[in-house]
Amino acid sequence: MIAELKGVGKEYQVGDQTIIALHPLDLSIKTGELTLIIGPSGSGKTTLLSLLGCVIYPTQGKLFVNDQLVNDMNQKQLAHLRLNTIGFVFQSFNLITPLNALDNVMMPLQLKKINAKDAKTQAEAALNLVGMLDRKKSLPKQLSGGQQQRVAIARALVTDPKLILCDEPTASLDASSIATIMEELVSLSKSGKSVCVVTHDPRLLNYADRVIKVENGFATEIKKNELTNAFTLV
């Protein structure tokens, strides 16, 4: 188990009003599984992902990531946990446009102060894993959307994280690119990593080991035998 939420909830104070972004829930993210987090826009999906990614603190309950209690950590400790345990893949790729694919993938290693030679070797290995080594010198603008996302996945993998969090990783991609990206994420989960994918796209349901539905700030697990009408769930 890589992450555990015990009665975890998240609220925001806006003036005199309390906004409940996520009602308290119990949830475990298991090793070697691909967990899909589904629900409409504004349902609380991104809040849940932000909690798992140690980007925000819970306002209720206890959050454990890699057997460490997140509630008690300061910002420096959180940054260290994220850098060494978690890989992030974003909808907008978040590649640095003046840098080529290899330099983009090397960025997290530079933050860890890995020497240049070792960083290059590790970055090339990550690009090779996603089938993009032959495009290592390409700038983001020279790559298709699917190729940019594969570079983003390589960047998330390069530090060998235990948990990979993906926020709408297939949005705006064509069907072929969606299949490629999801097959790579499934392969990563089968290699022993925990993968969580936030989406509102029911086409991704078939790739999941587990499905968490978030609606109006409430999160519940959907059983496999309840997925036949997938399009009614989101």
Question: Positions of the model-derived regions?
Answer:
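ABC-family P-loop ATPase nucleotide-binding domain
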Residues: 1-11, 221-234
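ABC family nucleotide-binding domain
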Residues: 2-3, 8-25, 29-207, 211-214
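H-loop (His-switch) and adjacent beta-strand-loop-beta switch element
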Residues: 211-224
